[in-house]
Amino acid sequence: GVEIDVTATMDQPVKTVTTIVRGVPRGKLSSSGGDFADVRDNEILLGYPFGGGDLFNAGGLTTPVAVIQSADDAYTTLSSLDDKVRTKRIYLQPGENGYKVELIHEAEGWLDLKTLRVPTWKISHTKTPEAAYAAHYEHIRTAYHFPDYATRPDVPAWLHDTALVLTLHGQHYTGYIFNDYARQLEILRWVNTQIPGKRVLAFLSSWDGRYYWDYPNYTVNDRMGGDAGFRALVTEGQKMGFRMMPMFGMNSANKKQPGWARIADAVTHKVDGDEVDLNWVDWDNDRHQEGWLGYMNLGVPSWRNHLQGRIDEMITKYGVDAYFLDIAGGWINDTKADMHAGMRTMVNELRAKHPNVLCCGEMHYDAMLEFIPLYHSGGGARYAKDYIQRHAKFFSHLSTPAPGRGSSGVHEAGFGRFNTETLQLNATSIPTLQLVDDTFDKQRETMAAVIKQARERAGI
């Protein structure tokens, strides 16, 4: 193999350093532990993390590694041996005799470094896909100090016994209510007749009002049942043993909400200065992206203090057992502060104050496994799952089709197809049941079947 170390110095801040490697064997491509795919003559751009700051232009990497299979027993690994979260891009341009590869490292946007030392790029050759990934995953395990799930201190005892997750869909962006607080409690009472509540985590999605529109207020919603209704949902649910986990947008804030001015300085700017809107969903169905959501940076104190305060109040006031961070893996290289450091600070400070309260993220990139032990997507990549699930567990995504019509509830995906054979369950995730508006009334048999599978898997 080959290790490449570069240091670049200029009389102005260095933004990126690109290492060009020619003659890399062509073949099928795998990235971040995923399956190998024939990419034919296509040019390929991969970005770490969160698409390397361009969500729609690059394939996403949860860790900066890609593997090319050029023969049955020939694998070439392209890996960054960084120990910090910093943007990487891997670009593959096909030629007749091999790839021209660009290995791109982007400097921290908030530092303005005139001398940039590029973390080691490693190119290695192995004979099996397992060997191709082994060294990289061992590197990130030690670089980021991943604790083992079985003994990590941020996993409360009840999570080890969790056999089922219920995703209780609340209020859509439009204001349509799938399940209000009273309805959610009614569902929990029935589920408790099918499986002990103490074995179930209740994920409260859009409990706070109109999905995304009411971010970042995070207060109970009058139309959903108000303070009394939410308090009854939590306390009565907990009496049955259920663990309650409300959802918070980690980096989402509506500029039209009255408190925007107090947090406006925390809106994200990419390394070249362009402001980032969370604009990739057409919420009002006008066939055009929206511009009212700012993409926020937890590294900036105003936003971190606001969000941390809202989560802290929900824990203190209502006694919830966990909190969920939406778009947790959405790190972008900002000009003001490090999102990763800000997230870690918030999670650690909340844990210090509430040591038995769980933090859960939507999706991860590698370094997050140090301080968040549960996610609801990203745990099943073929060659990565054994490494990742040594440190964290997963359940099914909010957008997974619900029984019946396949609704994604509050999530923007709309409708999919519920698989009646698999019940949308898989071996790498905690069994998960989506509950939208008609699930409890019309899909009770399917609910019972999912719960039966969860009981059997847990030996209940």
Describe the role of every protein-language-model region.
Residues 163-165, 199-201, 241-245, 321-324, ...:
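Structural preference for beta-strand elements that scaffold enzyme active sites
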Residues 1-201, 236, 243:
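Carbohydrate-recognition beta-sandwich/jelly-roll modules
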Residues 166-271, 305:
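Aromatic- and glycine-enriched glycan-recognition loops and surfaces
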Residues 206-208, 250-254, 328-331, 363-367:
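Active-site-proximal loop/turn and secondary-structure-junction residues that shape catalytic pockets
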Residues 111-114, 118-121, 165-169, 173-174, ...:
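Active-site-proximal substrate-binding groove within the catalytic cores of carbohydrate-active enzymes
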Residues 191, 200-208, 306-335:
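Active-site groove signature of glycoside hydrolases
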Residues 229-235, 246, 250-313, 317, ...:
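Active-site-adjacent "subsite" loops/lids of carbohydrate-active enzymes
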Residues 113-114, 191, 237, 307, ...:
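Conserved, mostly hydrophobic/aromatic
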